[in-house]
Amino acid sequence: MSLIKEYFRLSTEAVAKYGPKTFLLMQVGAFYECYGETSGPNRAAIDEFCRTCELACANKTPGIVMAGFRDYSLEKYLNKLQEAGYTAVVHSQDAQIKDERALSGVYSPGTFMTGESAALSNCVACIWLERMRSKTVIGMANIDVFTGRSSVFEVETELMHAPTTYDELERFISAHSPSEVILITDNFSQRMVEDLQNYTGITDCARLVHVLDAANATTNANINQIQKSKRQVYQREIMARFFGASASASHSLASFTSYEFATQALTYLLNFVHEHNPHLVHRITEPVFENQSDRMVLANHSLKQLNIIDDDNGAKSGGKCSSVYKLLNNCMTPMGARHFRTRLLNPSCSAAKMQREYDITDHLLLTTDAWRPQLAQLKDLEKFNRLIMLRKCPPQMLHALYGNLAVIEELHLAIVEDAPVGAYLHATNPLPPTTANAESVSDVCARLRHLLNTTFDMDRCANVGSDLGECDFVRSGIRADLDTLRAKHAGAIKTLGAVRDFLDSLILCGEKTKAADVVKIHETEKGGISLQATKRRTKLLADQIKRQGLDKVCIGADNCCLSLSTLTYPTATGANNEITSPQLSELCRSIIVSNQKIKDIVAQVYAEFVDKLRDSEPEFQQLIHFATTMDLLQNQCHIATKYKFCRPTIASANENGTKSFFDARGLRHCLIERLNEDETYVANDVALGSGEGTSSGSGGAVVPVGEGEQPRGMLIYGTNAVGKTSLIRAIGIAIIMAQAGLYVPCSSLTFRPYTTIFTRILGNDNLFKGLSTFQVEMSELRIILRMATDRSLILGDELCSGTEMDSAVSIFVAGLAHLHRVGCTFLFATHMHEINGYDEVRLLTKMCMKHLTVVYDKARDALIYNRKLADGPGASMYGLEVCKSLHLPDAFLEFANAVRLRHRAPPSDIGILSFEPSHFNARKLKGVCERCSSELAQEVHHLLPQKDADHMNYIGHVPKNHVANLMALCTRCHDEVHGTHNFNK
């Protein structure tokens, strides 16, 4: 019972430290076991353990239940626990001291690393949030344990608790998809913590979330570590420990003094990972400080609203066309796919960086497909590098590395004379060589291959996993003592074989048949090595020795003298006897001992080699950068040619301003044109803010562009399913691709880079549990109004669709006026035709209206969609056209149309027979206002004033009420004419 009491004590401590989703695994002999009580809270835990690991629960001790598995299956069950979101605390037995156990590892979803995992990354993140008097500050830190890369970010936002408050946090989570998240909050209620997990998608990607209240010591066992993470003395010590003594001089780390909460988050996270597995933070890279990057801000959940990545409902198993990332990711290596995702999700604002990508893509456009078969052979070199740093790389991995080095060397030799590629590699290398005589990639590959091949037999390494005793794979000449042992071992085996052959010959003297190998060399893990034969044959052997009067014989090339008189034949199994003697026992023992010594030395040589290989990390980083860059280049060239994308043109800023704009010709939606292969995709031309001076340039060169009088905003009208939202998304996707350095799905695109994209596309409210569509819309609109500039792109779909019409129209028009005043680029899909006649809308001179039409073809009984943008708002009765296609009753449709004509129809749709004649002249009808053409006429105005008429009602020679002297006007125009005497529109 003392063992079980110790188990429960350690388990209680583990749960208090690592959270309620924690299991303790204790090694007992050859098994790892988990215990619980037959009743009480511990019973539920053991039942959950058995369910997760698919194990049976045993009741061998009264009041105690247990479950377990063999020690060699530890990694298998650790993986099951990680997938289910549990932390496993493992206590293993000491190999030398009986009944002595110690903590051997803590494994959680974000700190578990295995070479067999097919995932591109495994991240653990720490989010530190604090609500202050007037703002909310969020510090974020992330570590990818597969690659050793880390990143940090800090944002200050409004105090309001709403989805848009956590926009940057949502982007951070979407970009890194951590499997484990630590949430440290201050001044947050439990409900608010639950909300922000839903708002940001933490609940969708993280298998384990630790919620720690920085202000409540009674509910937080880690409060001491949280408080220490705030103190600079601990921060400096941790940075120096994990990033080296020169960390304080690093540009990125020096920035931490300006970003307090990001520093605290990274400090706590580094300590958290170190306590789980110290090897995981060994030689991790200095963090990328995202606040200092030139990335474009993708606000209001743009990544998901534009389908750049799968939304929460897009299953991870979604097809190639479930997101832009999946469609465009044609990388052949895990490293390439990992870095391509980072690039696509963090588009740049730097024109120079974009131009560099366009130039190299143009240079390599038709050559990189030849690289794809070679790149497909490469394994995850970043993960290999981390496993080497962690000393967890098996010989099989070195065999794969050996082959990969040959592929990389071949690739490098193929492009070594290509000056533009060489310049690009140097410009994009985060750690360029520090000396002029630094080794080239091909030289590094050749040297490492030589080192591997001269140390190990690479063919044998291919079959050696984590058990280094499977075979001897170290080459001769590496260790003299190993070579001596091998010779001794081989001699002993040869002698044993010669003894067996001699005994075989003696037995066969008494046999009628001449079967070979009647004496077997039998080997077991527990029993060791021995000679065995059947009982009948061992009797024959004894008879032959006696008959021939044999006592001692010299056997083998080394003339081993074997004493036959001391042979005995104890029972081995039911059918066999063992053939043994003191001399044979010593020979067999020497074979076992020498074999074990060989295994020990092989393991020692291998461990020393891996330690030596760890010193080559700069060279590994050089190879990783080269292989990753080659894969990224082939990917961007491959998708450009495969999908017929074009090179974007970046417009330069000139004296007319620096406002962002775009001019897209032949714009396509890259996903829809792949999904709908039955019809040809209808491309559109869309240009906003491009100016009269826009030019497509030559060869993608930067060209000057004036602002001109081109519209900077657009309203798109049309029924649902006609393609409004798809067109809006296509614009956002094209801009993101262009600023990520990719070719775009257009026939041409000229643009000036944006710093921010805001989106508001319907269907987003499912992200925010408990909030209505209208609340979400207004939260996102608030952010747009507060942050939009003339370098922002706003993409909206049916804004204000979640409230009643009067409020919707008012809010929408006010929003358009604000965006027009700011000078940003904006597009909205809308059904609000009534705003076309508003004075406030008429004043928006840099906003245009377009429409996509749909009509019902009665003869074909089908809706005909014209997906080409047309000028103006178009007809306002497309809903009735859809109703016709659905065969609603004719009487119903006629009544609906009558209601529309009476209350909602624009003047142009009202029949002439509905117009009333003027009381001045029955031949003059009060139809549509002849001045503005947008309202029905309420007044009839005399062009030559009535006051000038004589007693005969003539004005000069013109009758006062002549049709030519009468003008039908709406009330507003009538008032304006009397005030200004201006009859023009």
Which residues does each PLM region occupy?
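Short Cys/His-centered divalent metal-binding micro-motifs
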Residues: 965-985
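ATPase nucleotide-binding head domains, primarily ABC-like/P-loop NTPase cores
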Residues: 259, 547, 551-580, 584, ...
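Short cysteine-rich clusters marking metal-coordination/redox-active sites
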Residues: 929-932, 970
